[in-house]
Amino acid sequence: MDAMDLSQRPPRKPRAELGGIIFLPRSIDKARAHRPGGDPGPYVLRGFTQHMLDMLGITQEAFVEVVAVAASDDDVLTSILARTSPEQIATWNAWVSARQPRNGDRVAALESYPWLGERPDLQLGLDVLEEDDNRYFAART
């Protein structure tokens, strides 16, 4: 897959799914941005992406290589499904769907995302990441 520039726009939304795997499209975008010629902007492969890979039993190196040689998202999905089980996917999806920022420590979350004080309705990490994307790119325009 071609490199991607995430300095100009965010990766796909945190709740986006591919093949029933939450966060996979976003992680693909981040891996593409780390390819030669790409620009990851503020995005890294640790964090949720690393948790996803760990829970699916895939190394970061293997994932980056799969994305590099894939022609499409479906190619990445085929490779992921060959390396993981439905149980691992279900465990990941349940974990990420319930995950709170900074393990539920609101004070620590406020240190990372000071604007959370204005948004007490955002309790889940996926929602916080989406709002953080929105705020980051709104501030750049």
What are the residue ranges of the model-derived segments?
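Alpha-helical interaction segments
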Residues: 13, 53, 81-85, 126
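Charged interaction scaffolds used for protein-protein
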Residues: 71-90, 97
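Amphipathic alpha-helical packing elements
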Residues: 38-80
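Polar/charged low-complexity regulatory segments
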Residues: 2-40, 49, 96-141
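Intrinsically disordered regions, especially transient/low-confidence alpha-helical propensity segments
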Residues: 89-92, 112
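Generic alpha-helix signal with a bias toward terminal, lower-confidence helices
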Residues: 57, 65-70, 75, 92, ...
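Short amphipathic alpha-helical segments that mediate assembly, nucleic-acid/protein binding
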Residues: 24, 60, 73, 77, ...
